Structure formats: C-alpha cells, structure tokens
Amino acid sequence: MVAVIIKGNEVAEKKRAQLTEEVVKLKEQGIVPGLAVILVGEDPASRSYVKGKEKGCEQVGIYSELIEFPETITEERLLAEIDRLNGDDRINGILVQLPLPKHIEEKAIIERISPEKDVDGFHPISVGRMMTGQDTFLPCTPHGIVELVKETNLDISGKHVVVIGRSNIVGKPVGQLFLNENATVTYCHSKTQNMKELTKLADILIVAVGRPKMVTADYLKEGAVVIDVGVNRLETGKLCGDVDFDNVLDVAGYITPVPKGVGPMTITMLLHNTVESAKRAGVVCK
C-alpha cells in the first residue's frame, strides 16, 4: 500500500476559490475585508512570508496594507501603531510578522491587538476561547492541519491523535483543536521516553519539531494519517520535512508532502479569518 498524498496546495486553492466568492458577495453589500500586516526589520524570511500574505489577499480580493518599520523602532511606537489599527474600521485583521527584534516584547505586542482583529489567533483571549470550544479565530497552521485531515474523509471523533511537538504556535493548539473534534490526544516532546510506542498508537500523527527526517516508518501504525509540519533546508538546498517521506510512504495511509503540504494552508486560514472578521464587523467601506 502506497500512501495517498494530501496535496495542501490543491486544498488551499479550492478554499481560496470559495473565499473569493464570499468576498464578492460581501463587496456587493459594501463590505471590503481588510488585513494590515506589520513588518519590522529586513529579515528575508519574514519578507518572503509577508509577500505570500499580500499575494493571497490580492487573489481573493481582500484589501491589504503593509506597514514597515526599521529594526530600531521602539516598543512604544509599535504599540501606538497597533492602537491606531485597532481603531481603523477599514482593517478587520491585524498581523505582526514574527519574530520581532530582541528589544521588543512579543507578548506585549500580541496582547495589544484587539481580540476582534486577532486573525493570527495568538491573543490569550483567542486561545482561551479555543480551549473552551467557543467561537473564535483559530490559529492558522493548526486550523489548516485539521482541515487537511478532514480532506481524507476520516471521522476524527474517537480517533487517537499523537502530536510530536509542544510549541505555542502549532503543537499545543493543534492538539486542542483535535480534542474539540472529540479525538483522544497524546503529546510527545523532547522529554518523552517511549515515543515510538506512543506514535505507533496514532491514527493521526502530527509532527512539528523542526528536525529533518526524524520520523521514519518504525514510528507509524500502518495506515496512519501523517501530517508533516516541519520545513527544513538541507545542505543541498533542498527542503524536507520532519518526516522521512520516502521511508514512510509504504506504511502511512495518507501523508502531506514538504513543500506544498501544510504551508499553503496557513496563509489560506489567515485569509479565512480575515473574511470572518469582516462578516462579524459588517463594516461598510466608503
């Protein structure tokens, strides 16, 4: 049995087409979804991510505003800019591209964004609502992962999900989202002593650790759904995930590739959150 490849880029395109239709209908009502992205400094990776977000907005018809600051900006000035955007009715979503310079406290910046415009889903209020199963903006990568698993038509309820990784951005929240779908969730991390025993119990295995090709066939139960969140660059320049793709291909039931797996879904769910925010606000742009 060779695993079915879950092509995240194709799933993302399908969802973006749906978002485009929604945006057209909103514009007919005078509502134009708007996203503001704040970029601090000249980090090439951050700039690349921001370009992807701008391109996504253009594709589905979302108004986007890029606000750039030098790396020397003070925390006070950045907070003031967020305050301005919180009060701007044209803007439904605010995203601050991370990481920030060391002299700026990321926690303070994230918490300054209005929860009603927190389309990244990082604000503690958004996280609390997610934990308690309330309607909120879900963090983009975890949300995208759940949507990819749903593409397999697997009934998540009652399944055993094992998450390798416990970051606040992916590992912790993705486990919570699967718990909200009535799955049984196990977390593995650097201190887990019997990891392979646990991962072999997984109907769905999520790998988000940043270690190239760490997960091999002996980690898997036959037929498992494998979602590879890692993006690592080898010395050859080639990208690879945290899963040894070729090694597990004959054991997994479904698997996401790297690239064109989870990555395209992250920006797509950001666009989804921005459109949802515009719907909630119901603001007419003049």
From Swiss-Prot:
Record note on quaternary structure: Homodimer.
GO biological-process terms attached to the record: L-histidine biosynthetic process; methionine biosynthetic process; purine nucleotide biosynthetic process; tetrahydrofolate interconversion
PANTHER family: C-1-TETRAHYDROFOLATE SYNTHASE, CYTOPLASMIC (PTHR48099:SF5), C-1-TETRAHYDROFOLATE SYNTHASE, CYTOPLASMIC-RELATED (PTHR48099)
One Pfam family per UniProt: THF_DHG_CYH
Pathway it works in: One-carbon metabolism; tetrahydrofolate interconversion
Catalysed conversion reaction: (6R)-5,10-methylene-5,6,7,8-tetrahydrofolate + NADP(+) = (6R)-5,10-methenyltetrahydrofolate + NADPH; (6R)-5,10-methenyltetrahydrofolate + H2O = (6R)-10-formyltetrahydrofolate + H(+)
UniProt name for this protein: Bifunctional protein FolD
EC number: 1.5.1.5, 3.5.4.9
Keyword NADP: yes
Record keywords, A-Z: Amino-acid biosynthesis, Histidine biosynthesis, Hydrolase, Methionine biosynthesis, Multifunctional enzyme, NADP, One-carbon metabolism, Oxidoreductase, Purine biosynthesis
Function comment: Catalyzes the oxidation of 5,10-methylenetetrahydrofolate to 5,10-methenyltetrahydrofolate and then the hydrolysis of 5,10-methenyltetrahydrofolate to 10-formyltetrahydrofolate.
One Gene Ontology term of the molecular function aspect: methylenetetrahydrofolate dehydrogenase (NADP+) activity
Binding site for NADP(+): 165-167, 190, 231
GO cellular component: cytosol
HAMAP family: THF_DHG_CYH
InterPro entries per record: Aminoacid_DH-like_N_sf (IPR046346), NAD(P)-bd_dom_sf (IPR036291), THF_DH/CycHdrlase (IPR000672), THF_DH/CycHdrlase_cat_dom (IPR020630), THF_DH/CycHdrlase_CS (IPR020867), THF_DH/CycHdrlase_NAD-bd_dom (IPR020631)
Similarity field: Belongs to the tetrahydrofolate dehydrogenase/cyclohydrolase family.
Lineage: Bacteria, Bacillati, Bacillota, Bacilli, Bacillales
